[in-house]
Swiss-Prot record:
<dbReference type="GO" id="GO:0005737">
    <property type="term" value="C:cytoplasm"/>
</dbReference>
<comment type="subunit">
    <text>Interacts with translational regulator CsrA and flagellin(s).</text>
</comment>
<dbReference type="InterPro" id="IPR003775">
    <property type="entry name" value="Flagellar_assembly_factor_FliW"/>
</dbReference>
<comment type="similarity">
    <text>Belongs to the FliW family.</text>
</comment>
<dbReference type="Pfam" id="PF02623">
    <property type="entry name" value="FliW"/>
</dbReference>
<dbReference type="GO" id="GO:0006417">
    <property type="term" value="P:regulation of translation"/>
</dbReference>
<keyword id="KW-1005">Bacterial flagellum biogenesis</keyword>
<keyword id="KW-0810">Translation regulation</keyword>
<dbReference type="GO" id="GO:0044780">
    <property type="term" value="P:bacterial-type flagellum assembly"/>
</dbReference>
<dbReference type="InterPro" id="IPR024046">
    <property type="entry name" value="Flagellar_assmbl_FliW_dom_sf"/>
</dbReference>
<protein>
    <recommendedName>
        <fullName>Flagellar assembly factor FliW 1</fullName>
    </recommendedName>
</protein>
<keyword id="KW-0143">Chaperone</keyword>
<comment type="function">
    <text>Acts as an anti-CsrA protein, binds CsrA and prevents it from repressing translation of its target genes, one of which is flagellin. Binds to flagellin and participates in the assembly of the flagellum.</text>
</comment>
<keyword id="KW-0963">Cytoplasm</keyword>
């Protein structure tokens, strides 16, 4: 499904639209429409750990999110070999509103969410 990015993706400010493809219940990827060579791996944070945060009011307004909206959340992943060494950024989740195909990334404060990290290893959450 193609989404319009309503606020810049950190480090990829030129991306305005991307295709979201779910790989399985844990992983997804986004591919830039204007530059298909840009592909970013995402993880479903809820499949990894207990994860909760408040979506700021300005993001709710930007994405037209209300109580009935179908919203999904993913976090960026830096893939490593082996996969359990890959790192997840829990402090900058991507918010997807499936109702109108819009998305935005937010930056959470470590002060407000001290249990979240920008580079948590997947192996800290996946049981072997």
């Amino acid at each position: 499904m193609v989404y319009e990015l309503k606020s810049p993706l950190l480090g990829f400010e030129e991306i305005k639209e991307f295709d979201l493809v779910e790989v399985d219940e844990m992983f997804a990827k986004i591919k830039a429409i204007n530059n298909p060579s840009i592909e970013i791996t995402l993880a479903n944070p809820y499949a990894l750990r207990e994860y909760s945060f408040d979506i700021p009011a300005y993001i709710q307004a930007l994405l037209d999110i209300n109580a009935q909206s179908k919203v999904r959340v993913f976090c960026t992943v830096v893939i490593q070999n082996p996969i359990d060494e890959s790192r997840v950024n829990f402090l900058a989740p991507l918010i997807f509103n499936d109702d109108n195909q819009t998305a935005a990334q937010i930056a959470l404060s470590i002060k407000d969410y001290p249990d979240f990290s920008v580079a948590d290893k997947i192996k800290n959450y996946v049981k072997e």
